[in-house]
Design a protein with these regions (language model features):
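Catalytic donor nucleotide-activated moiety binding site of glycosyltransferases and closely related
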Residues: 45-53, 84-85, 122-124, 128-164
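Donor nucleotide-activated moiety binding/catalytic core segment of transferases
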Residues: 93-101, 105, 149-185
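Aromatic- and Gly/Pro-rich donor/ligand-binding loops
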Residues: 1-66, 112
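A conserved, positively charged/aromatic
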Residues: 65-70, 171
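Conserved donor-binding/catalytic core segment of Leloir-type glycosyltransferases
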Residues: 112-125
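A short beta-strand/loop micro-motif in the catalytic core of glycosyltransferases
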Residues: 71-78, 178
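A donor-sugar binding/catalytic signature common to diverse glycosyltransferases
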Residues: 170-206
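Structural motif
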Residues: 12-13, 73, 175-176
């Protein structure tokens, strides 16, 4: 939706969130509108946003400072976002659960997977040497190796074109998960999987 399209809906309240919707450095989509820029809605609420790697020490765009001051209610999922918001509006956001913890998700089996497997999900904090060792040992123990949403020539298959429910199914059926992301941790926990974290950056897990 464009800002004009949203305004034409004449909404009474807009809820912004969650995930890294306030990571304005990410560069995906229209970052300004996620801070309320150009929205005519009388009530703006933020649920469990994250600023990702953004910092209050950055040279912040004006739309962020003005935008946050327009929100009637702000919550957050992590420490860095709390600090970020507090430094701008002088209020500490309410700490809330990421919405992925609030509901049960259906799953769908990914076709073509015939044997037990371990899975990598954006594990950028792991060295190439360690990954090669893990893959070698997995093969020796009879496990396939998959990457959910990422590519690496070490994997048997690169399951990039997954539906959301197939993606969940990849976690649910994995023997072990290696991840470097917040939601990689979340879905490993929700599906009671053994997992190991190699942090891409610390704020994404905190």
């Amino acid at each position: 939706y464009t800002t004009n399209a949203i305004n034409k809906l004449n909404l009474d309240c807009i809820i912004v969130g969650s995930d890294e919707v306030w990571n304005y450095k990410e560069g995906k989509g229209n970052a300004a509108v996620k801070f309320g820029e150009g929205l005519n809605c009388p009530k703006l609420v933020a649920y469990a946003p994250s600023v990702g790697k953004s910092s209050v020490s950055d040279d912040l765009p004006e739309y962020i400072v003005k935008g946050l001051q327009r929100f009637q209610a702000i919550s957050s999922r992590d420490d860095l976002t709390e600090q970020f918001v507090n430094s701008i509006v002088n209020k500490t956001p309410v700490r809330v659960l990421d919405p992925t913890f609030l509901t049960k998700f259906p799953m769908q089996e990914k076709s073509g997977i015939k044997k037990p497997y371990i899975m990598f999900y954006y594990c950028d904090g792991m060295s190439t040497e360690l990954k090669q060792t893990i893959v070698k040992q997995a093969h020796e123990k009879g496990y396939a190796v998959y990457g959910a949403g990422e590519g690496d020539k070490l994997y048997e298959d690169i399951t990039i074109n997954l539906t959301p429910f197939e993606w969940i199914g990849m976690f649910r059926n994995a023997a072990f998960v290696f991840t470097g992301t917040f939601h990689g941790v979340v879905f490993s926990i929700l599906n009671h999987r053994q997992f190991q974290v190699y942090m891409t950056n610390e704020s994404r897990i905190k």
